[in-house]
Amino acid sequence: MRFLTKFLLFLATVYFGLKYACESPLRAQYPQLQLACHYSQPALWNDYLLKNSPAYKNSVHPQLVVAKGKYEELVQPHVKDVCKRVHTQLDRIDKKKYCDLAHSYANLAYQKAQFYYSISAGKYVHDFCKSDLYNKNLKRHVERAKEDLSKAYHLAVVRIPQLFTRENVEKFTSSASAYINEKTESLKKEAKQITSDVKKTVESEIKKRTTSSESEEEPIVSTSTIVKTITRTRHSSSSTTSTKSAEETSEKNLETKEEEDITDIEIDHQAQLQRDFDKWTSNIDKKVKMVNKMLVRDVKKHLKPKIDANDKLFKDKLKVLHKEANDNFQLINKAIQDINCTQGIDPETGKQIYFDSEGKSQIEKYITREMIRTMLNDTQTTLNSLVADIENDVSKILEDFKKIAENSREQHLTTFEEWGDIMINEWSKKLAYLDVLAPHEDAEHEGKSKTELSEKNWKKFMAIKKQILDARDKMAKRQIKISEFKLLLDNVQNTLQAVTNENGEYLYILRAQANLAFQERERLEKEAEEAKLRKEAGEVNESSEEEQIVEEPISA
C-alpha cells in the first residue's frame, strides 16, 4: 500500500511537472516535449475512448461530464483563487537555493545508486550487455532511449531554471518598480501638503501673538538649560515723575516674579529629565541590538572565506571516503565470490591451482577465513581513519569560529563599555548640576520636596547604570549563531553519520555472506573427502575378497 501511494504521488508529480513545462515558452523548441504534451492531454484520450470503447462511452463518460460540471461550479473558483495566491508567493521566492538543494539531493541519490549498483548488480548487467540477446535485439532500443533521456535531462536541468531567473524576475521587477514609484510620488505629495499646512498654522499663530504682545508685554528669553519665557511689565518711558516708593514696590514685584519663574524652571527641568530618562532607557536597548547585529555581521564577514574553503574541502574528502569504501567493498565482494572455487592442476608445473566458481578464470590464491577477516578489518580501519580525519577538520573549524567570535565580541564589548562609561559620566554630571542649580530645598513638584525628587532621580540613574551593566553581561554570554556555518557543520556531521552507519551495516552483511560461503565450501569439501574415503574403502574391500578367493584353492 505504501509503495502504491508513493507510486501514485510520483505519477502526479511527473504529470503536473510536465503540464507546467507544456505551458512554458520552451515547448516550441523541443519536438519530444511537444509529443509528450500531446499524449498527456486528457481530452485526447477522452476522444479516443469515446470512439473505440462503448463501455466508456455509455457508462464512464456521462459520469465524468456530471463530475466536471460540479467541479467547475464548486471547486474551480476556489482553486483559481488558491493558484493565484500560490503563484504570487512563488514569484517572491528565491528559487535558486531550492534548485541547488534539489540538485544536491539528486547527486547524493545518484552516488548511492551507483554505489549499490556496482556492488550488487554491476557484474550481472555487465555479463548481460556482452550477451547475444542484448547486442542483437535490445541494444538499438536502449541507445535510442538513452538519447531521448539525455535530451529530456537537458530540458529539465538546463532550460527550465531559465523560467525562474529571466522572464519571471524581469516581470516581477518591473511591476515592483512601478508600484514603488507610485507610492513614492503619493508620499511626496502628502508630505508637501502637511508641510504647507503646518507652515500656515505656525505663521498665523506667530502673527496673532506678535500683535497682542506689542500692546501689553515685552518677551525676555532666559538661556538656561530649559528655555523659559519670562515677561516683565513694560514701564512707560514717559513716567519720569514716579516716586521712590513706587520704584521700590516695582523692584519687589520683579523679584517675586523672578522667584516664581525659577520655580517654573525647576518644574520644567524635572519634566525634561523624565523625558530624557525614557529616551535613554529605550536608547540602551537600541544600542544593544545594534551592537549584536554588528557583531554577527563581522563574524560572518570573517567566516565567509573559511566556510567556502572548508565546504569544498569537506566535499572532496567525502568523495574520497565514498570512493575508498566502494573500492574496498568491491574487492571483498569479489573475494567472497571466489570462496567457492574449483581446483585444478597446472600442466606445466604440476602444482595445484584454483579457478573461480564458474571455472573460467584463475584466481591468485586460495581464499581463507583469515584473508577475509584481514580484508574486513583493514577496510574498517581505513574508513575509520578517513572519518576521524574529517572530524578533526570539523574540530579545527569550530576552534577557528570560537576564536573569530571571541575576538569580534571583545572589540564590540570594548566599544559598548566606552559608550556606557561616557553616558554614565554625563548623566552623573547632569544630576549633580541639577542638585546645585536648585536654590530652594523646600521647592515642591507634584507634592514632593526637592530632596525627594533628587533621590528619585538618582535612583533612576542607578537603574539605567544597572541596565547598561546587565546588557554588557548578556552580550558577553550571548551565543553567536551563524546560519551558514551551522548548515555546513550539520551537513558534514549528518553525512558522516549516514556514511558510517551504511559502511558498518554493509561490512556486517559482507561478514555474514563470507561465513555462509565458507560453511558451504567446507560442507562440499567434507562431502568430497567422505566420498573419496568411501571409494578407497570400497577398493580395499574388493582387493581383499580377490585375495581370499585366490587363497582358498591353495589352502585346499
From Swiss-Prot:
The name this protein goes by in its record: Outer spore wall assembly protein SHE10
Major localization listed first in the record, in broad terms: mitochondrion
Basic and acidic residues: compositionally biased ranges: 190-208, 245-256
Subcellular localization, as worded in the UniProt entry: Mitochondrion
Residue stretches of biased makeup (Low complexity): 220-244
Function: Involved in spore wall assembly. May be a component of the mitochondrial RNase MRP (MtMRP), a ribonucleoprotein endoribonuclease involved in the cleaving RNA transcripts to generate primers for DNA replication in mitochondria.
Residues of the signal peptide: 1-21
Subunit structure: Component of the mitochondria-localized RNase mitochondrial RNA-processing (RNase MRP) composed of one single RNA encoded by the NME1 gene and at least 31 proteins. Absent in the nucleus-localized RNase MRP (NuMRP).
Coiled coil region boundaries: 135-201, 481-547
Cellular-component GO terms for this entry: mitochondrion; ribonucleoprotein complex
Keywords associated with the record: Coiled coil, Mitochondrion, Ribonucleoprotein, Signal, Sporulation
Record-level GO BP terms: sporulation resulting in formation of a cellular spore
Family: Belongs to the SHE10 family.
Sequence segments annotated as region (Disordered): 190-263, 534-556
